[in-house]
Amino acid sequence: CSLCSNSHSFTYSMVVENVLGITIPDRARYLRVIAEEIKRIASHLFNTAIQAHIIGFKSLFMHVMEVREMMQDLKETVYGNRMNLAANCIGGVKYNVDAELLEYMRKTLDKVEPQVDEIRDIYDTNSMVLARTRGLGLLPREDAIRLGVVGPVARGSGLRMDVRKDAPYA
């Protein structure tokens, strides 16, 4: 799907490079990780917005989508696409980041970070959110291990894991 599209070309490129013995430049590795992290933030914001919509918190849904839009604009500026980044290729990446683009990325993330902190605070403290989510969708730790879940689902089940750290891919 477009929410995780960069992950597909990222992993495909890594598999082919591994099979063919291709070592990519460090800069390309860093740029791949940057693309993946930008995509990940936008994807998590989208899922957070959908959760707000499902529990009937329309204003929070709109707010989170506005923050996500900043990430979508960032993706479009950096990669030329808002959804399917097409950032990776076998042997490297299809884009570069100059000082001006890097500054744009920093400024965007500096705007997004406090918004994400505010959204997190709403989810952690708002009585309506808590009333409509507390005790729902629980996945016991043992089931999470057995099912091999990762990411927010794993952390929500009490597993202190992050595949980016536990099994680095770049």
Spans of features found by a protein language model:
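Active-site bordering "gate/hinge" segments
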Residues: 1-170
